[in-house]
Amino acid sequence: MKIAVIGAGIGGLTAAGLLCQTGHDVYVYEKRNNLDQVGAGVGIGSNVLKALKQYKMAYAIEQEGQSLRKIEIKSDLDEFLNALMMNQDDNLNVTIHRNVLHEILKTHVPKERILLNHKLTEFKQTPDSVRLYFENGVEEQFDLVIAADGIHSVVRTNIYPKSTAKYAGYTCFRGVVNEKLNLEQDEALEYWGHKGRFGIVPLKDNELYWFCTMNAKENDLQFKSFEKPHLQAYFNQFPNEVRKVLDAQEETGILQHDMYDLVPLKSFVSGRVVLLGDAAHATTPNMGQGAGQAIEDAVTLTNLISDRDIESALTRYDKIRTKHTKKVILKSRKIGKSAQTSSTLKIKIRNKMLKKLSSKSLSRKVRFLQKAKLK
């Protein structure tokens, strides 16, 4: 089957690599003139690694990633609240540089099949084909089109004109440092406070990925102008680990993005066009499942196309992925609302509830991620 993938991000490259493995004629179209990745660290859950094992993609990610055993949650006063145990039942979770993950995925797609400077402007469908039109004048026809063109997807906007990114109410800064803290190498740490959150996550070779989130207006000019000294001043009352990480951060290399998600869609399929990853179900990063859910989409779609006729495969993909990713979006949104509250009373209640909850009970709240259907 001749298949086009729109977008060469994590979801698009995973889908292309898997479909190439299973014998399809695949082309990836990327609007940019390069494949450089902007990002810091990314989490890959055990649910995702399990899904990839049958296609021999998991091994390289496990080798290049850092095992993550536990995420400890503390208050901004360094008070222990709870811990999410990650590697239960021998389920491996890893963290990895986004650009390293991207390079791994890229090796599974023939170089000549990734076409840069191809910005999609329009598509037209017949019952059994899709014709694509690009800004550079190229036109091509395919049996199936996979839209993995991100949260601001041109394809999704064409299918659902009213589906636009929904601002979550907070902005996020991120970076990577080489700094030794009083942490186990497989242990992450999050501080939840009145002024926001600060997370510290291990990467391979003693590097640390850090992030912080602060409540803000959309496109807030105050935070757009933030540099290292501003972050140091903002978090100067947070525990010493936070200050050490920010001190270690280079002046350059700090990323800032406002956080968005999508209102869950009723369908990811329109004829022979299928949405995948952020184009279908962009979520806030509170569960660390953005990249993972895109990869799960790709695995599920590949499994189904291998076992069924195209119409049946797309119907099944639509049914199981819309249901599962809706739960992820809403759960992540709920976590963000609780974690980002600046109300003294709500923080007091939240912290008290977290301390009362057992670690096992906390882990059970995300156990549904392990039960995703992949075909």
What kind of region is each of these model predictions?
Residues 330, 334-375:
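Alpha-helical membrane-targeting segments
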Residues 82-102, 136-138, 179-254:
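Conserved FAD/dinucleotide-binding core of flavoprotein oxidoreductases
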Residues 34-50:
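Conserved N-terminal glycine-rich FAD pyrophosphate-binding loop of Rossmann-like flavoproteins
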Residues 3, 20, 45-174, 219-232, ...:
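Conserved N-terminal helical subregion
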Residues 152-153, 172-174, 196-199, 280-281:
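Histidine-centered metal-chelating micro-motifs
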